[in-house]
A protein has these predicted regions:
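Charged, terminal alpha-helix-loop-beta segments
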Residues: 1-158
């Protein structure tokens, strides 16, 4: 099932080495901005979710066989959660990428009895992605929404 998580964009600007794509007012400009926000707010995804950390390596851009997992986390039961981010629309091809990462973590990182599951977070989940994940019980889909609230600090009255 798709779950909605409402987030607020933080005010700090991050330097990234990506070209900006045209952005709607309700999405992050860069995947790294979404990643940084979620790393600081993993509880929005699931209570008890923590960033993976071991031997000085954390779960941000976690290396897996020459590629990188956007966020590797551990849930409240101690199981791994592989999180793949798409700043705009999530298409079905992301499923293969996520399954490859899940298989790598199962093979290289897990202890006996430890499970691995995946989460895809995108601004918009395509119908093809919904269909592709419909029989995969180990993958959850989330759509994110941004909101911005303004608070008057001082009025400029005459």
């Amino acid at each position: 099932p798709i779950q909605n998580a409402t987030t607020e964009k933080h005010s700090e600007r991050l330097e990234v080495e990506e070209e900006a794509e045209p952005v709607g007012m309700s999405e992050f400009a860069y995947e790294r901005d979404l990643q940084n926000y979620l790393v600081k707010n993993l509880e929005l995804i699931e209570p008890g979710l923590k960033l993976y950390e071991d031997d000085g390596i954390n779960g941000i851009e976690f290396p897996v066989g020459g590629r990188f997992i956007d966020i590797l986390a551990v849930d409240s039961k101690g199981d791994f959660v592989v999180i793949e981010l798409k700043v705009a629309r999530g298409y079905d091809r992301v499923v293969g990428q996520l399954l490859r990462y899940i298989a790598w973590i199962k093979k290289e990182q897990t202890d006996p009895g430890q499970n691995v599951r995946g989460i895809i977070i995108a601004r918009d989940i395509s119908e093809d992605l919904l269909l592709a994940c419909s029989s995969l019980t180990s993958i959850e889909l989330f759509e994110y929404e941004l909101s911005l609230a303004l608070k008057l600090v001082q009025s400029c009255e005459d």
